[in-house]
Amino acid sequence: MMNNPRHNIREVRAPRGDKLNARYWTTEAPLRMLMNNLDPDVAENPNELVVYGGIGRAARTWNDFDRIVASLKTLGEDETLLVQSGKPVGVFRTHADAPRVLIANSNLVPHWATWEKFNELDKKGLMMYGQMTAGSWIYIGTQGIVQGTYETFVEAGRQHYGGNLKGKWILTGGLGGMGGAQPLAAVMAGACCLAIECNPDSIDFRLRTRYVDEKAETLDEAMEMIERWTKAGEAKSVGLLGNAAEIVPEMFRRGIRPDMVTDQTSAHDPINGYLPKGWTMAEWREKRVSDPKAVEKAARASMRDHVEAMVAFWNAGVPTLDYGNNIRQVAKDEGFENAFAFPGFVPAYIRPLFCRGIGPFRWAALSGDPEDIYKTDAKVRELTPGNTHLHNWLDMARERISFQGLPARICWVGLGDRHRLGLAFNEMVAKGELKAPVVIGRDHLDSGSVASPNRETEAMKDGSDAVSDWPLLNALLNTASGATWVSLHHGGGVGMGFSQHAGMVIVADGTPDAARRLERVLWNDPATGVMRHADAGYDIAIDCAKEHQLNLPGILG
């Protein structure tokens, strides 16, 4: 593509307040959330339409962005916009309870589902990488993964350190849109964190948004901070400027032993997401365009070195976990047979939550007023009496998390709670307690909406890790149930060929019609997660299905 239709220095921010720019709130909501994804306070590289996760985009080109906006502004309440890999391709007559937008991003026939084929199509302008919430317009900034990371660290602390992470520290890499959650999540869990990041702008972004506490230029400087904080029992974090592929092995050689090791570099994308050892940032940026194959080769070799060091920590008795960026797979493909020695975070720490349909429920205030979020926080507390763990999370979130773009909240709840919260929020809008409607969605990383054998569905009890019928059924059911927009993606989190996943978002606009849709969608969506795990034979899921009287004929009999 000549003259790069993906580059445009313009500032996009979602409208605020209760004035419509589209014809209905069900079309205003996707309009605002699309724009919010590209807010400079939200997106990692908004001028290139990149929201997070390497090259995870909100729209294919700026012309496509403009066409999507124009379509949403005129879309009828009985029409549905179809978006194919970030390009608006059709508007069709449906009905009022149908989704207003249906999105398919980055999907390839399995035999051709490789980065090589994707990059070929991407260069021709035929596709874009949607990541998970980038191309589905429900990214809320780094907050979106904070609680999941917090839950992981807390459970790891319970399993390995008797539930107390005071005086402990976590080593990780990556401070991008997802990895940037790690330092704050660690601090919330009571630990210190040393996060290695090669891009100084990313460290500065996390400092500005209060996700990391300090910045260090050298390993010695960072370790001095870690030693001082852990000795004092303080929970603080530092972003170390450098290359994880160089520094993690060096730390092991020096005899430095963290209390936990993980990684959240963008290793899922070996061309755009991972700086090779010995390369400068300038060299990397130039060669990604001039010689992408050389970049990929060097990055993959560097990832092997990185994983070898992580396995060395694991073998030395340090709890080590893969945080879902597919770095182990790359290392194995590069000849390191023991790359999967340490577990992924889902089977190690999170799966019992998924068995009950508990996952990253989130909502955003279309008014733009933080008070609307604080009021909904209070409503969540009111409707979940006795859930002290959740209440503690809400307290910490209000104190520590800075809103990026439209105010939003992440809150891990499951089947039986999501629909109650959605109905309560809708009633608050109806009564005028909130200044404008709210949108309710989730990450694609949820209990019933993803097939990802190296991440969410790793080591399933029945061996069904790679079965991707489940996210397809989830998307179909959410469409039939009346979600406001539904998305079906490929390759999020772990890269091309390694995942399929679905998303949904629904608007609470205070109307009775919205209430009916909310009750259906926010019950059915988490119920698919319980169904999926019950089918795999997990007793927790089977008990949850029975408790909620789910009708699962081929599973419960």
From Swiss-Prot:
Bound cofactor: record note: Binds 1 NAD(+) per subunit.
Superkingdom, natural source: Bacteria
BP terms from Gene Ontology: L-histidine catabolic process to glutamate and formamide; L-histidine catabolic process to glutamate and formate
Family, per entry: Belongs to the urocanase family.
EC number per UniProt: 4.2.1.49
Keywords: Cytoplasm, Histidine metabolism, Lyase, NAD
Catalytic residues (UniProt): C411
Broad enzyme group: lyase
Gene name of this polypeptide: hutU
Catalytically driven reaction(s): 4-imidazolone-5-propanoate = trans-urocanate + H2O
Main function: Catalyzes the conversion of urocanate to 4-imidazolone-5-propionate.
GO MF, any single term: urocanate hydratase activity
Alphabetized Pfam families for the sequence: Urocanase (PF01175), Urocanase_C (PF17392), Urocanase_N (PF17391)
Protein name, entry field: Urocanate hydratase
Annotated NAD(+) binding sites: 53-54, 131, 177-179, 197, 243-244, 264-268, 274-275, 323, 493
InterPro entries: Urocanase, Urocanase-like, Urocanase_C, Urocanase_central_sf, Urocanase_CS, Urocanase_N, Urocanase_Rossmann-like, Urocanase_sf
Entry GO terms, CC: cytoplasm
Annotated metabolic or biological route of this protein: Amino-acid degradation; L-histidine degradation into L-glutamate; N-formimidoyl-L-glutamate from L-histidine: step 2/3
Primary localization class, coarse: cytoplasm
Cofactors (names): NAD(+)
Subcellular location per the Swiss-Prot or TrEMBL entry: Cytoplasm
